[in-house]
Amino acid sequence: MMISGLRSSFSFFTLVPSRQKDIGNPITFLPLVVTVGALIGDSILYITWQFSHLIASFLSISSIIIYNGLNHFDATADLGDALMVRDKSRIPEVIKDHHVGAGGIFAVIFVYGIAVLSLARSTLYIGLVGILIGQVVSGSSMMISLIGSQPFVPGLADYFISLFRKHSVGYTIEFLAIPIIVSFIFSPLYVVIVALNLLIVQLTKTMISRRFGGINGDVIGFLGEFSRSLFIFMLIIIAHYNVASTYDIFSKMLSSFTS
């Protein structure tokens, strides 16, 4: 059962292939999936940081996008195009359209540009922490967005909402507790950033849901990407103004490796 759940999570949320025809329940092990993505992004950031902060940041975020199979990247572009549509009845048609318009291009540049530029302006330590917690918050944001939601078209959102409702209390606790615990390990202040991040993302979901008449897979994917970028941006601002101390045990360990 556990192996099947792991396969479902990795095959659905990443480019890792699987022979399973039924996607099963990919929700439970999503925190593990996003953590692996964070380790990939952090590894690339750490290795390439000495050459160019901007290139290192770009490669790190790109590696996570590729690890996700470009699914959420595509979702971000689709949502950007859909938000440009004035006629509500045309939204499902625009989201399914494979062509990318001005709205989609802007959404991609905005969401990923925030993450890349923020990382490039940070220290290596803050960048590594930002990617790790940002990934965890990203996964939680996607799942928490299912609470009280309705799909505006039949599809993956409908399936995920039904899965979530079967264990709504357990999943809600899981996806709220994990980012809080992970962020608290580094700094209690990061818990505040996580809480504010989740609140902003859920408010964003509410506005999109009212505009579209519900959510779909693209909305869920976009919220995850937006959440990661938003967390990294917020963390870098806090660190820039020295509100959060980076002189903890993890910072000292990293300094010993890089010195």
From Swiss-Prot:
It holds the Pfam family CobS. Its cofactor is Mg(2+). The chain crosses the membrane at residues 27-47, 51-71, 100-120, 124-144, 175-195, 219-239. Its EC number is 2.7.8.26. Pathway: Cofactor biosynthesis; adenosylcobalamin biosynthesis; adenosylcobalamin from cob(II)yrinate a,c-diamide: step 7/7. Keywords: Cell membrane, Cobalamin biosynthesis, Magnesium, Membrane, Transferase, Transmembrane, Transmembrane helix. It catalyses: alpha-ribazole + adenosylcob(III)inamide-GDP = adenosylcob(III)alamin + GMP + H(+); alpha-ribazole 5'-phosphate + adenosylcob(III)inamide-GDP = adenosylcob(III)alamin 5'-phosphate + GMP + H(+). GO terms for molecular function: adenosylcobinamide-GDP ribazoletransferase activity; cobalamin 5'-phosphate synthase activity. It is a multi-pass membrane protein. The keyword Transferase applies. It comes from the Archaea. It is found in: Cell membrane. One of its GO terms (cellular component) is plasma membrane. Joins adenosylcobinamide-GDP and alpha-ribazole to generate adenosylcobalamin (Ado-cobalamin). Also synthesizes adenosylcobalamin 5'-phosphate from adenosylcobinamide-GDP and alpha-ribazole 5'-phosphate. PANTHER family: ADENOSYLCOBINAMIDE-GDP RIBAZOLETRANSFERASE. Belongs to the CobS family. This is Adenosylcobinamide-GDP ribazoletransferase. The lineage of its organism: Archaea, Methanobacteriati, Thermoplasmatota, Thermoplasmata, Thermoplasmatales.
